[in-house]
A protein has these predicted regions:
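A short acidic, Gly/Pro-enriched loop at the edge of an enzyme's catalytic core
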Residues: 109-119
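A short glycine-rich, Lys/Arg-flanked "PGG" loop and its adjoining helix->strand segment in the class I
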Residues: 135-147
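Helical scaffold of the NTase/Pol beta-like nucleotidyltransferase catalytic core
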Residues: 276-296, 323, 426-435, 446-447
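Catalytic cores of NTP-dependent nucleotidyl/adenyl transfer enzymes across multiple folds
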Residues: 371-447
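Conserved class I S-adenosyl-L-methionine
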Residues: 2-48, 61, 65, 150-183
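Active-site nucleotide-donor binding segment shared across nucleotidyl transfer reactions
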Residues: 283-315, 319-321, 325-328, 397
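Class I SAM-dependent methyltransferase SAM/SAH-binding core
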Residues: 61-107
Length: 447
């Protein structure tokens, strides 16, 4: 809630109910945005007849286009009038949408976990003024998305309003200085009047898009400037047809992912993926916890679970010898390389490799490192628990992982961690190294 007891959700519902054709006509006028977005959908969507949720899809401009291409599309929108218009437009196009559902993007409880192969969230994030609501909408989009499925999340850019004013109402900054300052400082265009009216919006800064999606558990593949190079300059281009129009579509699709243009467009499109590894790890953890197998998650997954935005290529689970063979017994159908004692010049462990829906999992029992002529147990000295989809996951402190990467010479990975580390914890572990020469997983260099 903002502006007293005014509910922005009801305001925006009225806004679209009053003119349900508004969004359909907007995309007719702004052909470049539509073309670039369709290009992204064509690149990242799984092939038809994949199940697609168009959440906040308005009168169904994208939903109907995807249905024409063979996708099974559920259209979900806040506005009943938008949904009625979508039915009419679908009939005109002679296509059938799977369902028409009315509701808010922060509550998709009518849909089961993993119900869709892809999710479009191209509208709701324009109007959710509170950060918690934007996070909730992304969390719900992730929940109903199948592991490995893409999300397409659209935002209005922080600078869309002043750019619009420059093109259409140059006196606007002088006439509305307080509104301009609030948008620049907070991104919020709040309800006006006691009952609220007009366009309620949140204008996202380009720099916040990726972290917001990552905190919701997505891995971001791209952020696109939907208008490409023609933001506020598109009238002439949009009047083109044939080869000339196709050439501009190709150019704008090619440059859309260039970070240098993201502050100079009206709409940003984040393309993200619900990583399979999170779902796989949660499933494994529940079974290991139930079986009483002690383990810790290490490597990139441990860092990502602490909130560091890095891609995870595989899962490393560290346990003892008995735990490694117990893991193999529990997941015998997933064995790629059976657990066995393996060693090289530096490391020795009871190592096995497994495959879960394309995610490689390594189980490491009693990891040792050669020190001099002896094998020394390499173990962590810290532990904390993080929650992953309701499953408690044991991981080392992020600070210990950061120091481990320093020791290994992976300064790039260590630097990614340091911004998220607790300074006092980091210093405490470093002082422990100074006193003992050992910090958790093994020695780290003195410098």
């Amino acid at each position: 809630m903002t502006a007293g007891h005014v509910d922005p959700t009801r305001i925006i519902e009225r806004y679209y109910d009053q003119q349900p054709g508004r969004e359909w006509e907007r995309l007719e006028r702004h052909r470049t945005e539509f073309a670039v977005t369709l290009g992204a959908l064509g690149t990242y969507l799984p092939p038809p007849p994949a199940r697609v949720l168009d959440c906040g899809g308005g009168p169904g401009r994208y939903a109907i286009e995807l249905a024409c291409r063979g996708y099974e599309v559920t259209l979900f929108d806040l506005s009943a009038a938008n949904l009625r218009l979508a039915r009419e437009k679908a009939d005109e196009a002679d296509v059938t949408l799977t369902a028409y559902e009315q509701g808010t993007a922060t509550d998709l409880s009518r849909f089961a976990d993993g119900a869709f192969d892809a999710t479009l969230l191209m509208g709701p994030l324009y109007h959710l003024l509170e950060k918690g609501d934007r996070q909730q909408a992304l969390a719900e989009a992730r929940r109903v998305l199948k592991p490995g499925g893409p999300l397409f999340a659209a935002f209005i850019s922080r600078y869309a309003v002043p750019r619009w004013a420059a093109a259409n109402e140059p006196a606007w900054p002088l006439e509305h200085p307080e509104e301009l300052e609030k948008i620049l400082a907070t991104g919020v265009l709040a309800p006006s009047g006691e009952e609220g009216s007009g366009f309620v919006a949140y204008f996202a800064h380009p720099a916040e898009v990726v972290p917001l999606c990552q905190r919701a558990g997505f891995e971001v593949a791209a952020v696109l400037g939907a208008e490409g190079l023609v933001s506020m300059l598109e009238a002439g281009v949009n009047a083109l047809s044939g080869a000339a129009w196709d050439a501009w579509v190709d150019l704008n699709c090619r440059v859309a992912a260039d970070p240098s243009i993201l502050g100079c467009v009206e709409h940003l499109l984040a393309v993200a993926v619900k990583p399979r590894w999170r779902t796989v790890l949660a499933q494994i953890a529940r079974q290991l916890n139930e079986a009483g197998v002690a383990y810790r998650v290490g490597g990139g997954a441990a860092i990502a679970l602490h909130g560091v935005p890095i891609p995870v290529k595989d899962l490393d689970l560290v346990t003892d010898v008995a735990g490694a063979y117990h893991f193999q017994a529990l997941f015998a159908d997933h064995v790629v390389e059976p657990v066995a004692l393996r060693e090289d010049k530096v490391w020795r462990s009871h190592l096995g490799r497994f495959d879960f829906d394309g995610v490689t999992v390594e189980i490491i029992g009693d990891l040792h490192r050669r020190k001099g002529g002896e094998w020394v147990l390499a173990t962590t000295v810290t532990e904390t628990t993080v929650n992953l989809d309701g499953a408690p996951i044991r991981v080392p402190w992020l600070e210990e992982e950061a120091l481990f990467y320093v020791w290994r010479g992976r300064l790039d990975r260590a630097a990614q961690c340091l911004h998220y580390c607790d300074r006092d914890r980091l210093l405490a572990l470093w002082r422990q190294k100074q006193a003992t020469g050992v910090c958790g997983q093994e020695e780290i260099p003195s410098f």
